[in-house]
Amino acid sequence: MSKRFSFIALAVLTLITSSQAQEKRGRIRDFGIQIGILPTGTNNAITDVAGVTVGQKTLIQGDQIRTGVTAILPHSGNIFQEKVPAAIYVGNGFGKLMGISQIEELGNIETPILLTNTLNAPKVADGLIDYMLALPGNEQVRSVNSVVGETNDGGLNDIRGRHVSSKDVLEAIQAAKSGPVQEGNVGAGTGTECLGYKGGIGTSSRKLPTSRGGYTVGVLVQTNFGGVLQINGAPVGRELGNYYMQEPKEAHKVDGSCMIIIATDAPLSARNLERLAKRSYIAFGNVGSFSSNGSGDYSIAFSTNTKNRIPHQSDKPVFDQEDLGNDFMSPLFMAVWEATEEAILNSMFMATDMTGINGRTVKALPIQQTLKILQKYNALDYDKLPKAIQK
């Protein structure tokens, strides 16, 4: 056997062994874990809200580049010309979210929502503006409020290199589609960490019963924060021996950030969308986070309801818009809590081990160990319990 053939055979064997060592990954429902009592949408994703699409560009190059961009489009038209109602809730403001002040002032968004890493946010905004100015119908546009969220992936990525380009932004937007959404180490979640393990992109949705409006709520998260991991009340992080304040010399990464994007087809004003966005943080506490000092935690909610779109130009001084009554908001509040919590957990269950800058490795959550812990605390098989009304 030649030396060259021996080297190739050894490399293939190493690759196979490494692949076998990686646990089978999947979404939490694939392993019998259920959050809440409401049913999911068809794909259990933010794209279950009609018209919403998601596109991603992942950058994994050499030993140091572990980053990307994720694009969420509220509808398939020109969003600058047909804006949608929106609101932002700030859980902890240690972040660089772009576009926030105009959204708070006017209550709408006029671009797709893009997610990336902290130092790339201005470059991504630049690419997003290029995209918007080039859209047919925007030839006279001289002001664009680009919406770009971020988390700091510098633990695995050469963040100072600012590797996401305008071309990557355009490719992510052009790749946007409905249906299932990639999760884990993809797009803006490529280099993120969550609750002591590899984080990433996660998504989930909830469908309300007809008697409660029949509306859909979809959530997409970019997880990059710390704490003490809990799943359905089970102390998973403590059982695994990986949690915040475990030891005097802190190894657990507690700072980071989380971006939460919420879509719904319910007819909501910016006021009620902010109320909806607030409830997403119930999920934060449920999974064991507390919005640390250095965590930039933002929730952006928008409504796709076509009756509430805001034309960029109109001769009408008064708009006819619908807003769900306050007394009918509670089912949506529950839906956003459930979907956010499941999206966070999906981001971790779908993530895989990653080695990045300076040879640093972040392990994925060990699923089989986690399932044993959940079994120990009777936190599995919730699908056998009574659920919400179906009609």
PLM feature spans:
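Alpha/propeptide regions of enzymes that mature by internal proteolysis
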Residues: 22-391
